[in-house]
């Protein structure tokens, strides 16, 4: 992300929460979950030198590899997948979501190991409406969930899904995998 909606000149992943850079806090959460986990970070090419400088300035020691981000999330993930060894289990997470808890990560990995994939979801508490040119009506929110990250997949499923051409309807990795014909858990 670039921080455009936040009207920040600094990309949001480089902002601080409680004196810690957001992306570093996010990475620390995953590193604490599993210190042997390979961490791949997709960043726009123009931000890589900033990241390297921040890591040096902050004495950030968590091992990770950088991959070049793409035009969209789809392209960023597709670029990163070239570094995935198969078979493995892959978690895709938004670097600006540092408050994910260990239990959510654990459940997602366990479910993906058992079923091939897992996405965390939460209930919607707000009212939901469908609005089109011909209708504007309330819909039962019990049928809808908010999708979060990390989204976790067995590597063969994710690698196969990303062989597809880009579709602007892809909003996350689950939508890419689902479009390839795989049921999402």
Task: Show where each model-derived region lies.
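Short beta-strand-to-loop acidic/aromatic patch adjacent to the donor-nucleotide binding site
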Residues: 87-97
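Glycine-rich phosphate-binding loop at the start of an alpha helix
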Residues: 24, 74-78, 102, 171
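A structural signal for isolated positions on well-ordered beta-strands in alpha/beta enzyme cores
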Residues: 38-40, 65, 185
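Hydrophobic/aromatic residues located in beta-strands of well-ordered beta-sheets
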Residues: 39-41, 90, 117-118
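Conserved core of the sugar-phosphate nucleotidyltransferase
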Residues: 99-185
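Residue-level signal for inorganic ion chemistry
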Residues: 14, 23, 80, 93-94, ...
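Short phosphate-binding loop-to-helix
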Residues: 56-89
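N-terminal glycine-rich phosphate-binding loop and ensuing alpha1 helix
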Residues: 1-49
């Amino acid at each position: 992300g670039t921080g455009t909606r936040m009207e920040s000149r600094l990309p949001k992943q480089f902002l601080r929460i409680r004196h810690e850079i957001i992306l570093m806090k996010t990475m620390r959460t995953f590193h604490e979950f599993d210190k042997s986990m390979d961490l791949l970070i997709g960043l726009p090419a123009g931000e890589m030198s900033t990241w390297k400088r921040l890591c040096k300035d902050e004495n950030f020691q968590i091992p990770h590899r950088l991959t070049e981000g793409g035009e969209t999330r789809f392209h960023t993930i597709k670029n990163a997948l070239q570094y995935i060894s198969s078979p493995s289990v892959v978690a895709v997470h938004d670097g600006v979501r540092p408050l994910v808890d260990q239990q959510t990560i654990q459940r997602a990995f366990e479910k993906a190991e058992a079923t091939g994939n897992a996405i965390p979801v939460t209930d919607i508490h707000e009212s939901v409406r469908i609005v089109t040119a011909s209708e504007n009506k309330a819909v039962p929110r019990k049928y809808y969930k908010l999708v979060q990250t990390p989204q976790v997949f067995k590597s063969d499923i994710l690698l196969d899904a990303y062989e597809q051409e880009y579709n602007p309807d892809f909003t996350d990795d689950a939508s890419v995998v689902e479009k390839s014909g795989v049921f999402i858990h």
